């Protein structure tokens, strides 16, 4: 029986679900967390692939890779300052959580992703901002970059 290889994006989603901020919102609202598909619900999450050359450096033994992933969230939207502050605060706290996890080297588990991938870091490359808004909700996005080593 062959071993099932898990996509890197699935490992990143599993890691993000360990963030207390996301876990609390999912528990409180029942928010879905999809891969490449943000629903129109008032609160929902999605992680998506971003195009680009993933190879940073080529070595004799393998490659240093980097993949960019937009993290999207559907959130309540209003002209009321309290709602805007809450949305901004969510992404600020998420950015800080990612930075702390990187500093502690608590990175996504890529062991089930095949190819001997070893994570080396994760960073937020664009902070959270509104992409679109309509009818009481908005789509916000934050960009992350996962770096890892993959042997040949």
Please state what every model-predicted region is.
Residues 1-35, 51-152:
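Charged, amphipathic alpha-helical segments and their flanking helix caps
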Residues 38-42:
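Short beta-edge strand/loop motif at the mouth of beta-sheet-based domains
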Residues 43-50:
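A short, hydrophobic beta-strand-centered structural micro-motif
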